[in-house]
């Protein structure tokens, strides 16, 4: 009864409160939903709120705050009074027949008033059909056993060409790096040998010619060295097997026990002395030695107190 009276009042006051106001235009595709909020005065908190659809014969109520706000079966419009002067209306699963003009109304102390008007336009599902067609074409392309290629996507051969070129470029860079490293290592080794040869040449030229003996023979360590590398070999001292040493009296003048004969000792290996000082060679004649005047030549150090050995 109350709703009937409200509709009658709306028929009489159709233009009151909405003169000069235009409805809000909303557009939504088929199957979507809209959410509309309406503001009312705080004095109308306990008043009845209605969401209705404007028709030529009047405003048809769709949902009201006075009834159960739970969603019944088949209902696609919901009204919620949030309090504080805010009313919220939601329409879900829109269809083409839902297009039209809607409004929020409140039955307050001043009578029925329209709070907000909405003009809803439902878009046809053309875009959705095109999207569905594109999706079905993609599914058919993937499900085709013949492997029909999509013209929008490049083939597998076209995709593999950049990968092949990238691999070739990477291999070329690696080969160039290895060759450059080998050339630098060889050049560095050649420079090192040249510096060593110049150092040895300068050292040989600075030494006393009388103290240096160059041996170039077919045997010994000098034969194993290359001809382009300068080398030095000093004469080794005479062996203890010489008859000059074996004929010397080895009795100690102080009565100490004499040392064993040198011939009983193992021969010492030749010593190679590299020294920058000149070496003095002298002939020493031991008294009481070999009557035949046998002498032995060998390297001798400088005598102490600057005394020159007799010859």
Swiss-Prot record:
Residues 239-249 have a biased composition (Polar residues). A lipid is attached at residue 196 (S-palmitoyl cysteine). A motif (ITIM) lies at residues 279-284. Residues 229-263, 287-311 are annotated as: Disordered. Residues 184-311 are cytoplasmic. Residues 16-162 are extracellular. Residues 1-15 form the signal peptide. Phosphorylated on tyrosine residues. Changing residue 6 to V: In a breast cancer sample; somatic mutation. The chain crosses the membrane at residues 163-183. InterPro entries: Ig-like_dom_sf (IPR036179), Ig-like_fold (IPR013783), Immune_rcpt_domain (IPR052314). GO terms for molecular function: transmembrane signaling receptor activity. The keyword Mitochondrion does not apply. One of its GO terms (cellular component) is plasma membrane. Residues 16-121 form the Ig-like V-type domain. GO terms for biological process: calcium-mediated signaling; innate immune response; platelet activation; signal transduction. Cell surface receptor that may play a role in the innate and adaptive immune response. When phosphorylated, interacts with PTPN6. When phosphorylated, interacts with PTPN11. This is Trem-like transcript 1 protein.
């Amino acid at each position: 009864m109350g709703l009937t009276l409200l509709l009658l009042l709306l028929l009489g006051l159709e233009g009151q409160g909405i003169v000069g106001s235009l409805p809000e235009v909303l557009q939504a595709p088929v199957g979507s939903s809209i959410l509309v909020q309406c503001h009312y005065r705080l004095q109308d908190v306990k008043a009845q709120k209605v969401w209705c659809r404007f028709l030529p014969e009047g405003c048809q109520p769709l949902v009201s705050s006075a009834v159960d706000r739970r969603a019944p079966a088949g209902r696609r419009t919901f009204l919620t009074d949030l309090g504080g002067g805010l009313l919220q209306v939601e329409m879900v699963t829109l269809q083409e027949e839902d297009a039209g003009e809607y409004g929020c109304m409140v039955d307050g102390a001043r009578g029925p008033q329209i709070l907000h008007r909405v003009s809803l336009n439902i878009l046809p599902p053309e875009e959705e059909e095109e999207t569905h067609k594109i999706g079905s074409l993609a599914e058919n392309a993937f499900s085709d056993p013949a492997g029909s290629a999509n013209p929008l996507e490049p083939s597998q051969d076209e995709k593999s060409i950049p990968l092949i070129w990238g691999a070739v470029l990477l291999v070329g860079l690696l080969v160039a790096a290895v060759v450059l490293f080998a050339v630098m290592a060889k050049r560095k080794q050649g420079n090192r040998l040249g510096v060593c040869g110049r150092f040895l040449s300068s050292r040989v030229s600075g030494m006393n010619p009388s103290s240096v003996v160059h041996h170039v023979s077919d045997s010994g360590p000098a034969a194993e060295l290359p001809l382009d590398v300068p080398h030095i070999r000093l004469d080794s001292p005479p062996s203890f097997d010489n008859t000059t040493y074996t004929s010397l009296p080895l009795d100690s003048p102080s009565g100490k026990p004499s040392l064993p004969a040198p011939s009983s000792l193992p021969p010492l290996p030749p010593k190679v002395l590299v020294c920058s000082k000149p070496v003095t060679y002298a002939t020493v004649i031991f008294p009481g030695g070999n009557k035949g005047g046998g002498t032995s030549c060998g390297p001798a150090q400088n005598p102490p107190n600057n005394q020159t050995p007799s010859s």
